[in-house]
Amino acid sequence: MRALLARLLLCVLVVSDSKGLVSTIESRTSGDGADNFDVVSCNKNCTSGQNECPEGCFCGLLGQNKKGHCYKIIGNLSGEPPVVRR
């Protein structure tokens, strides 16, 4: 279930970013309330295969693009300890 949720989240980020719809923070909550997390922009662009994102952030890419944007996931996922903001 977590893997499916993560894939769905990444898909939403990629599609939203390609359409310019991602704001600074995107909140997501599962239907049963078990998962509650935010996707936060790290305010940095990135390149595939490089280590350009700040610590704790990942590079979100659209399709086969080599350029993307850095994001961080903050919050609770089922069965995992809470992620703490730094």
Swiss-Prot record:
GO biological-process terms attached to the record: negative regulation of chemokine activity; negative regulation of protein homodimerization activity
Residues in the signal sequence: 1-20
Keywords recorded for this protein, A-Z: Disulfide bond, Glycoprotein, Secreted, Signal
Chief localization: secreted
Job description of the protein: Salivary chemokine-binding protein which shows chemokine neutralizing activity and binds to host chemokines CXCL1, CXCL2, CXCL3, CXCL5, CXCL6 and CXCL8. Binds to CXCL8 with 1:1 stoichiometry. Disrupts CXCL8 homodimer formation, disrupts the glycosaminoglycan-binding site of CXCL8 and inhibits the interaction of CXCL8 with CXCR2.
GO cellular component, one term: extracellular region
UniProt protein name: Evasin-3
GO molecular function, one term: C-X-C chemokine binding
Domain of life: Eukaryota
Location relative to the cell: Secreted
Subunit structure: Monomer.
Glycosylated residue positions: 45, 76
Disulfide bond annotation, renumbered to this chain: 42-57, 46-59, 53-70
